Each structure stands twice: as C-alpha cells, then as structure tokens.
C-alpha cells in the first residue's frame, strides 16, 4: 500500500466516522437504534450505495468485529453491578444455554423449510442467529430505568450467551465440512464445558491478576485505561487460543474490575466509554460495507418469514421454557424479555465462519444473518420504548447528579464529587445548610451561584439555580440525589408506584378494616413484608408488582435487599 492509498484510507475512514457521529442524533428523532445509523452509513458507502466502495475482505471484517466486540464487552462488564446477579444470574444462564439451543432448533427448522436446506444446514443458520448481541443490548438498554430483574437478566444473558452460539456454529461447520466424520455426544459435551469452563476460569483469574497489577502499578493517569484494555485483550486472546470463550472471559474481566476498588476507575470508564463508541461505529461501518443489498432481493420474502418467525415464535418459546423454573418473572416480564432478543454484530461475525471455512452455501448464510439483524434492529430495537411501557417494566427515572467524577485520594479510593443543580421545586431552597439532613460520610465541598464560588457556612441559604459540589461515595448517591436532584418528569411513569405508600412493618390486620381485606387463613401478626415475600418470593426488586384482594401492590423501596415500603394503587371505583 503506497502513501496515496494510505491517505485515501485515512480520509475515507475518518469521513465515514464523522458522518456516523453527526447523524447519530437522528436515531432519537426517528425512534431507531443508533447502531442502525452506523450500519446504514456503511451500506450507503458500500458497493450498491452512492459511495461505491468495493469491500469484500471477510478476514479484515472478522478482525475488526472481534476487536470491537471485545472492547464493548469489557466496558459492559465494568458497568454491570455484581449485586444484580442476586436476582438475574441463574435465569440469564438458563437463557444463555437452553434458550440459545431452543432458538437455534426452532429457527433452524424454519430455515431448512423456507430455503429448502438440509436440516443440518438449517440448524447452522439457527446457530448463527441464535444468540442475542451484547453490543445491541448494552447500547439500547443504557440509561434506561428498567426493572432490575428484567434489565440485569437481559444484560447478563447477552454477555454470556455467545459461547453457546459459537459452540453450536463451530460444531455444525465441522460436521458439514466432514460429513463422514461422526462426533459423539461426549465429545460435543466436553467441547461445550471447555468453552464455558475455560472462559469463566480465565476471566475471573485473569481479572483478579489484572486488578492487582493495576492497583500495584504507579503510572501516568492516562496509562491505567490502556493497561486495562491491553490486559483484557490478552485474556480474551489467551482464552480463545486455549479453546475457551474469549467473549465470556473479557466480560468477566470487566465485571471483576468494575466491582472492585480499582485505581483510576473513573478515568478508565471514561476512556472505555469513548473506545466503546469508536468500536460500535467501526464495527457496524465495516459490516455495512461488507453487505451488498442487491444480494438480499432474492431472499426478501422468505427472509422476512424467517426473521419474524424467530422474533414472534422461536425466541418467545425459548424464553418461556428457559424461565419455567423461575417463578419470580411475571408474564409481562417474560414477554418483554422475549421481545428484547436483539440481534446485532455477533450473528454477522458468526456468519463469516462458514465463509472462511469455504462451506457451500456460505453466502446464503451470511445474507440471512444480515437480513435477520436488520429486521431485529428495525422492529425490536425501534419499538423498545413502547414495549417497556406496555410491559410495565420501565421504572420512574432515578434522580441523578448532573455529573460525577472520582477523587484519587489513595489508589483504590471510592470517593467521588457529585455535582447537582438545584431546581425551584426542591424543599431545601431557602434553607440554611445546617438544616440539611446530609447522609453520613458526605459533605458539601463547594457552592456556585451565578458563576461565583461561595464560601458556604452553616447559615448559607440555598437558592434555585445553585450548583452544589458534594463529596461522598456511591453508597450515598441515592440519598444525595433524592435530596438535591430532580428526575425527569413523566407523569405516567411517576404514577407507576401507586396512589400512596406504606411501610412494610405495618400489620395487615391494621389495614384490613380500612380497605376491606379478608385475612382468612393468614396469621394475625402477618406484616406487609411477609405478604410481599409470600407473593413475590425471597428476592423482590424495585418495581415488582402483584394483585391481591382488589388492590395493586408495587415494591417502591428497597434497602440492602429488603423491601422497606410498597405503593398501593386503589381500584378506580374505590374512594377514601
């Protein structure tokens, strides 16, 4: 490649990236996933688009996509709270294994019938599109206030279901490439356990080693993120090299680092946030360039049938069967999880495997995977907000600070500065600072008014528009935000928790005469907390709901895993 070609490459790459960034606000206005914007830019720049760029290098696309996916999973793991595993780990693993297998089987049979394929070829198509995509799920769920059980299940599933899809895809390619070779069940089982086992061991072990290395190292501030990124990629590559799941390993590395006091954690997350955006843009641009839309014309009708068959039948069946042992999921929860079976880059990456293996019909598999991804992003991704509202899994937006940043007092410092802007509706307006019930271990470090830094004392009275800089830790964030912040207004969602609230230590016997409750066969000293456990099980989450004796009960407050208060919605005909 000469200097002119290199400059042309830089020019085109930078131009496409800039166009993708500038067009990204269109996603919210049009109600479509931002990933689809990036993909569309790549398609328009490609062979059939006005850009006319001829790109058919599957090896390069495979390299770029795997690198991008690894970075996205590392970032996603660091932002996942391990506390969510309490309610979501086993359901997510069930979806990541049995769910993928069921989706693969049903989708595979549909593909074999629709495209007149051998049943093994159909199963290969099912395996390629069988897993949800971490990049798509993390991107579309980011910033949404969903029921913790539902949101965490979807995120953990998307980060852990790729090993099953890769295992099925690689196994089926090996069978189709060597039709005379018999593969025993024990061989396939061992291969599956190896992928998961090595992926988990290397991810957790490597994550621990990387965490120790980061905290023991004394580097320039900007180098910690590079160390984490390079260390994560080393573990990702080593896991793949040894026959494990690199995708699972790097997700667990991020999970480990994100839930430990790590030196420079906030700076690392800030850098990874930018790297994740670059990865998403680069990955979907390259995949868009790889597609020739005219190749999809021949599979248009059966392709739609396959995509909607998977969305409306295969995925829901897989979800309902996989979640049968978990009674805490309501029908609405299961429906929403079924709908958010988003496909993205992973199916397209897996579709490159048959191309690189030289299998007959590989181009058809690739085109089908791309078509299913397009339909999934357009239909499921664009309707995510509506689906969350209909399923009633969207919670009121949490009050949050305007910004937050870490304070590196010592290597593993957990101190942060939270910045709040006071609105006129806050009760603390006009009150002196000494009257504020600040959480323990927090302090107002600075007050800004009209771009002027004040020297606050106990008698300083707060005014609307004041900007407060509060020193504290994440454990105090909720209390501080309730005190100073204001969640975006959404009356329909705000009514989510009910007409009024009661504490869970109240006895049902005290409520019975007020609301006409029948307490037959219930203990006289039974409390609201006991009722919640009876109805929802031992691990309720914020937003869980149940109907009991004409009243609608909603979990409205939690502290250290225990319900502190519930909201009650009265029947419309009830009057106080």
From Swiss-Prot:
Chain segments annotated as coiled-coil in the UniProt record: none
One GO process term, biological-process aspect: cell volume homeostasis
Pfam hit, one: Na_H_Exchanger
Ranges that cross the membrane: 6-26, 34-54, 58-78, 87-107, 109-129, 163-183, 185-205, 219-239, 242-262, 271-291, 299-319, 335-355, 359-379
Catalytic activity: K(+)(in) + H(+)(out) = K(+)(out) + H(+)(in)
Main location (coarse class): membrane
Entry membrane topology: Multi-pass membrane protein
Annotated family: Belongs to the monovalent cation:proton antiporter 1 (CPA1) transporter (TC 2.A.36) family. NhaP2 subfamily.
NCBIfam families: PRK05326.1-1, PRK05326.1-2, PRK05326.1-3
Name of protein: K(+)/H(+) antiporter NhaP2
Species of origin: Shewanella baltica (strain OS195)
């Amino acid at each position: 490649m000469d200097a002119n070609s290199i400059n042309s490459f830089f020019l085109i790459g930078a131009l496409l990236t800039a166009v993708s960034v500038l067009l990204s606000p269109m996603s919210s206005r049009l109600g479509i996933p931002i990933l689809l914007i990036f993909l569309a830019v790549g398609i328009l720049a490609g062979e059939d688009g006005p850009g006319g760029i001829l790109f058919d290098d599957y090896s390069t696309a495979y390299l770029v996509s795997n690198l991008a996916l690894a970075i996205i999973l590392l970032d996603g793991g660091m932002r996942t709270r391990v506390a969510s595993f309490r309610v979501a780990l086993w359901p997510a693993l069930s979806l990541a294994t049995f769910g993928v297998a069921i989706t693969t089987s049903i989708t595979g049979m549909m593909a074999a019938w629709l495209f007149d394929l051998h049943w093994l070829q159909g199963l290969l198509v099912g395996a390629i599109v069988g897993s949800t995509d971490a990049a798509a799920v993390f991107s579309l769920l980011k910033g949404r206030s969903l029921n913790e059980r539902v949101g965490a299940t979807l995120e953990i599933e998307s980060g852990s279901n790729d090993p099953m899809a890769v295992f099925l895809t690689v196994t089926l390619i090996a069978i189709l490439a060597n039709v005379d070779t018999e593969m025993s069940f024990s061989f396939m089982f061992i291969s599956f356990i190896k992928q998961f086992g090595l992926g988990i061991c290397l991810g957790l072990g490597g994550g621990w080693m990387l965490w120790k290395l980061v905290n023991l190292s004394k580097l320039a501030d900007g180098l910690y993120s590079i160390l984490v990124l390079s260390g994560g990629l080393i573990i990702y590559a080593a896991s793949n090299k040894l026959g494990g799941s690199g995708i699972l390993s790097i997700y667990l590395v991020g999970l480990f680092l994100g839930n430990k006091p790590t030196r420079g954690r906030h700076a690392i997350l800030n850098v990874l946030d930018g790297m994740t955006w670059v990865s998403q843009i680069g990955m979907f641009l390259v995949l868009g360039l790889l597609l020739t839309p005219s190749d999809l014309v021949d599979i248009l009708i059966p392709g739609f049938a396959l995509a909607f068959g998977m969305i409306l039948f295969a995925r829901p069946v897989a979800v309902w069967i996989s979640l049968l042992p978990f009674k805490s999921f309501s029908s609405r929860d299961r429906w929403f999880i079924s709908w958010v079976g988003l496909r993205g880059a992973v199916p397209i990456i897996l579709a490159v495997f048959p191309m690189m293996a030289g299998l007959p019909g590989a181009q058809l598999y690739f085109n089908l995977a791309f078509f299913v991804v397009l339909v999934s992003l357009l239909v499921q991704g664009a309707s995510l907000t509506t689906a969350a509202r209909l399923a009633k899994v969207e919670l009121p937006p949490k009050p949050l600070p305007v910004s937050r940043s870490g304070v590196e007092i010592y290597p593993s410092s957990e101190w942060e500065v939270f910045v709040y802007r006071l609105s006129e509706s806050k009760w603390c307006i006009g009150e002196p600072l000494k009257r504020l019930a600040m959480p323990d271990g927090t302090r107002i470090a600075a007050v800004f008014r009209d771009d002027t830094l004040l020297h606050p004392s106990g008698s300083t009275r707060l005014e609307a528009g004041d900007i407060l800089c509060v020193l504290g830790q994440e454990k105090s964030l909720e209390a501080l935000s309730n005190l100073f912040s204001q969640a975006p207004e959404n009356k329909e969602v705000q009514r989510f928790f009910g007409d009024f609230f009661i504490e869970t230590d109240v006895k049902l016997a005290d409520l019975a005469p007020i609301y006409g409750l029948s307490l037959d066969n219930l203990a006289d000293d039974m409390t609201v907390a006991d009722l919640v456990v009876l109805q929802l099980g031992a691990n309720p989450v914020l937003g869980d709901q149940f109907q009991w004796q004409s009243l609608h009960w909603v979990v409205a407050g939690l502290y250290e895993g225990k319900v502190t208060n519930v909201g009650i919605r009265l029947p419309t005909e009830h009057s106080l």
